[in-house]
Amino acid sequence: MRAAWLLLSAIAVTAGSAVAQETGPKPVLPDTVPFEAIPQVPGLESKWLVGTGADSSLYLLRVRLAPDTRLPPHTHPDSRFTQVLSGTLYVGFGRTFDTTAVRSIPAGAVFVTPAGTPHFVWARDGEVEYQESGEGPTANQFVEAPSP
């Protein structure tokens, strides 16, 4: 009887640790998630690292801009935290893309764009990679439809 009890205890401990491992954090390795081109904005690629922005959960979106890519003025229904990972991102606020009204945001810097605030970004000096996080649902709503 004692042997059976020890065996059951060992199985329970082993099964418990397996369940704990399955429910623990699951790292996302960005290099394993492919970028997808965004046809509305040539030169812009993105990939969802956490969530999809479609529901009321947290999300993390990675964006890559080819040199001189301009993301036209747009808004989001949620506030977004943006961290520049590489390159220098030029950001402006307003309903018109104004190259004289941009501010340079270097790699490592973070800024917040409040919900509903029209803004635009530009990879003026070369390729830029940044990531945005927030709580969905989210979307891009262009002030004017981007030209092809």
Please annotate each region the language model reported:
Residues 24-26, 100, 120-148:
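Double-stranded beta-helix
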Residues 95-115:
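Short acidic-glycine-tyrosine-enriched beta hairpin
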Residues 66-67, 76-96:
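Glycine- and acidic-residue-biased ligand/ion/polar-headgroup-sensing regions
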Residues 59-76, 105, 114-115:
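Conserved short histidine dyad/triad with adjacent acidic residue
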Residues 71-73, 91-92, 113, 118-124:
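Short beta-strand His + acidic residue motifs that chelate non-heme Fe in jelly-roll/DSBH
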